[in-house]
Amino acid sequence: IIYIFLVYRLSIKTKIFSFILIICLIYPTFLTLNNDYKHRYFSDIRLIIGENGLKNYLDNSTYGSHRNVAKEIFLDNPLFGVGIKNFRFESANEKYDNLEHKYNHKRVSNHPHELYYEFLSETGIFGLICFLIFIISSISLSLKNYLKHRNIYQLSSLIFVCVSILPIIPSGAFLSTMVSSIFWINYAIMIGYNKVNKN
């Protein structure tokens, strides 16, 4: 959707109206067709907008239990974590059976559903620092290049990459899912235009 709005020369009013219309058509349809998603969506929204907001959500959801065990895994393995794609095994370790969380019994998952918890638990502080240096320097270089050449494809990929690394936003397994494929495609476009514009 972002590509369409950036590429086609439409007035800002038309873009905003089109975006709202698309969301208003797609979202309710998706909720209607998938009962599990609908239930999860509305129960999560109730927790977030209720008293104590985000804290309440993290204390009373399975995602909160994933983050809680990820934090404990990181504290047990602070430098290098437990290894890429090993959260699924380590979260099932019986030493985490007695963590204080309402849904601790549902803590076992393929990944912690949040980028920074995933990096901290699987690669430790070393892996997270390496990733941050790598991604921030890439974004900085691409932003400078965009400001110089104003390439809208690079801008849309830059926006996608920046939004994908925002803290607290739930995410898929960053190193092994379709979500990560989409991220790396956008990253490649973002970086690729740096080289194109130098030639």
Which residue ranges define each predicted feature?
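Transmembrane alpha-helices of multi-pass inner-membrane enzymes
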Residues: 1-5, 24, 131-134, 157-169, ...
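Hydrophobic transmembrane alpha-helices and their immediate junctions
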Residues: 6-8, 14, 122-165
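A membrane-periplasm/extracellular boundary helix in multi-pass inner-membrane enzymes
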Residues: 7-55, 68-76, 84, 89
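Transmembrane signal-anchor hairpin modules in multi-pass inner-membrane enzymes, especially those
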Residues: 12-17, 148, 194-199
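Hydrophobic membrane-targeting alpha-helices
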Residues: 28-32, 62, 138-145, 165-169, ...
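Membrane-interfacial segments
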Residues: 37, 41, 142-150, 174, ...
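Long extracytoplasmic/lumenal interhelical loops at the membrane interface
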Residues: 54-68, 72-76, 80-123
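Generic recognition of well-ordered alpha-helical segments
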Residues: 69, 90, 115, 119, ...
